[in-house]
Amino acid sequence: MHVKKGDKVKVITGKDKGKSGKVLAAFPKKDRVLIEGINMVKKHTKPSNVNPQGGILNVEAPIHVSNVMLIDPKTGEPTRVGYEVKGDKKVRVAKKSGEVIDK
């Protein structure tokens, strides 16, 4: 998967196209990511011990990883991700600037 938790990404398709946010969680088996403030859905909750009132909450829903692009740390623009072997480590590299993403 080309994005990881903590990456800054931009949504390229869908109802939140053009918005950007930080990846809160990645689900590689499902090819989905959870992004802060993106793809908000209303979740209806029953009253419980934690939330005695119950009600409707706004929460983020995961979106498919193909709908997001990583933001290049050097230029601040969306970029594709490549991989290079540096020493004995495989690192992610921004295609636009050549900047190494993994530190």
Curated annotation (Swiss-Prot):
InterPro entries cross-referenced by the UniProt entry: KOW (IPR005824), Rib_uL2_dom2 (IPR014722), Ribosomal_uL24 (IPR003256), Ribosomal_uL24_CS (IPR005825), Ribosomal_uL24_KOW (IPR041988), Translation_prot_SH3-like_sf (IPR008991)
**One Gene Ontology cellular component annotation held by this UniProt entry:** cytosolic large ribosomal subunit
GO MF annotation terms: rRNA binding; structural constituent of ribosome
* Keywords, in A-Z order: Ribonucleoprotein, Ribosomal protein, RNA-binding, rRNA-binding
Superkingdom, taxonomy of origin: Bacteria
Q: Does the keyword ATP-binding apply?
A: no
Which cysteines form disulfides?
none
SUPFAM superfamilies found in the cross-reference section:
Translation proteins SH3-like domain (SSF50104)
> What range does the record give for the signal peptide?
none
An individual GO BP term: translation
**Oligomer status and interactors:** Part of the 50S ribosomal subunit.
Q: Which HAMAP family match?
A: Ribosomal_uL24_B
Provide the function of this protein: One of two assembly initiator proteins, it binds directly to the 5'-end of the 23S rRNA, where it nucleates assembly of the 50S subunit.
Tell me which family the UniProt entry assigns to this protein: Belongs to the universal ribosomal protein uL24 family.
UniProt-recorded name of the protein? Large ribosomal subunit protein uL24
The organism is Listeria monocytogenes serovar 1/2a (strain ATCC BAA-679 / EGD-e)
User: Mind giving the lineage of the organism this protein is from?
Assistant: Bacteria, Bacillati, Bacillota, Bacilli, Bacillales
UniProt lists the gene as: rplX
